[in-house]
Amino acid sequence: VTQQTAEWNAEKAQQIVQAVIDSGETFNVIYAENDNMAKGAVAALDKANISHGVGKDVIVIGFDCNTWALEELLAGNWNYDGQCNPFQAAYIDDIIKNGVTTKVVIMDEKGFDATTITADDVANYGI
């Protein structure tokens, strides 16, 4: 397992993944905390002719549910993309500290798998 920070940046992610590829270390999963980092990681895989996505050599996981990223899922180039809203943190903190019980949903958290995503999902949930 190799873990490095790409600082939310596609170019930095590409450099990191390229360095891992160049090291000869084997891997089969890219887990990126945002879609841009996943995009950069995939660029390094593509440059090295390493297959990725459904049924391929490397599983690709991103977060943010950008429309373009969901389209990568739909095409089978990525395996999973999720939406996790950081704005919920203040609400959760308030519940813990003050016992607030009213439900506030800022954004539904979603997750999409490449084997089940539909064009409607891309249209309805892509940002």
Describe each model-derived feature in a short phrase.
Residues 1-127:
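A residue-level marker of the well-folded mature domains of exported/periplasmic proteins
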